[in-house]
Each structure stands twice: as C-alpha cells, then as structure tokens.
Amino acid sequence: MFLPAISELEPIARAAGEAIMAIYHQPFAVEYKADESPLTAADKGAHEVIVQALARLTPDIPVLSEESDAETMQVRCSWSRYWLVDPLDGTKEFVSRNGEFTVNIALIEEGRPVWGLVYAPVLDKLWYGGKEIGAWRVADGECEAIQVRPHREGTPWRVVGSRNHLSQATL
C-alpha cells in the first residue's frame, strides 16, 4: 500500500491555503454551480494548486476534485486508487468570512480512505492521519499525535457539520 509522506503533502495543502487566503481578505465574486452551491476564485485557485502538485508528485494516481470535470462513473469505478480532493470545503463559510473552511485531501484505495489531510488556513492548523500512521495535529510549528476514540457499541455517534447545512435532515 502506498502512503504519502506528510512532508510531501503538507506543502501542497498550505500552498492551496495561501491561494485561498490571497482572495479571502479582498472583494471577490461568487458564481453558482448547477446545484446552486457557490463557487469562487479561491475554490478554483486552490483546485489548480492541488491538482498540479499531485500530478507532479504521483502522476499515476488520478485526482477526483469537487472543482474538476468529473470522469464518468464507469471510468471512476475502474480506479483502484485515487486522490479525493475538496480544495475549499466550506465555500459558504468562506463567502460569509467566518473562517470555518478547510482544504481536504484524501487517498482512496479499493474504495476506502487510507490517508487524509485537513488544513484550516485561517487557523493555520493541519490534521492528518491514516490507519498505518495514526492521527496527528500540526499547529504552531509543532506536530503531535492525537487520539482517535473508537466508537462504543450502543452509544450515539458524534457528527460535526456545517452551520450552513443545518436542517432536519442533518439533525
């Protein structure tokens, strides 16, 4: 199983975060996709940074990004391994300028996530992990292991969601 080194992917996430933050503190336009979700130059810029960097790092691994023209389902089903990317997760939060958005990069193998990274540019905090490496937080230049609690049978799941997606369906 291929597992990327954080030293290779952290700079990609941070560069995407820089592209986002360059737009965050200035006026920007908001477009709307077919599903009526917002799209900004920050989404597009972060997408380009990540897709180009992953293509250089792992040219044999396809990238499925929220902002790219998706391959057909038939093609995607043939992928045994791919990068799954949301270059700016929380565009509504970005637009409202509340700081609650992230850069998300995951490696999927045989339909299961094996490695993932979440970077919060406003907080300058990064979390990453995988089955083989555990879970880690990087903040203030320090990297520390964090604990992942296993779910105990019979206890309710704790789920975190965006305030902009709060509805009866998400409760």
What are these regions (language model features)?
Residues M1-L88, N164-T170:
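N-terminal subdomain of lithium-sensitive/metallo-dependent phosphomonoesterases centered on the IMPase/IPPase/PAP
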Residues I20, D43, L54, T91, ...:
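Residue-level signal for inorganic ion chemistry
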Residues I23, E93, V138:
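Residues that scaffold the ATP/ADP-binding catalytic core of kinase and kinase-like folds
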Residues T72-M73, K92-V95, L126:
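Conserved protein kinase catalytic core
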